[in-house]
Amino acid sequence: MTPEPPAPDTASRDAENLDAAAAQQRLRKLHSKATRLKLDLHDLAEDLPIGWEGLLDVARRTYDAYAEIALLEGLAEKETSR
């Protein structure tokens, strides 16, 4: 059994209403944010057990950023295949 994806946040729900240019701009910002979060998660993991309390929060935000990237890229792919 695969886990259910998290409920989409407001940005994810609004992603379907973006035009192509706005979606590309959003994707660029999300890629930057996701990369920063990935590095934060890596740094936090290196310092374990110090700072373990923040691990789940950073992991969730990283997951959410990459989930939204996947959503936007999937929508962009649908648009180009029409």
UniProtKB/Swiss-Prot annotation:
> What's the superkingdom here?
Bacteria
Q: Which UniProt keywords apply?
A: Nitrogen fixation
UniProt GO BP: nitrogen fixation
Family, as annotated? Belongs to the UPF0437 family.
Q: What protein is this chain from?
A: UPF0437 protein in nifX-nifW intergenic region
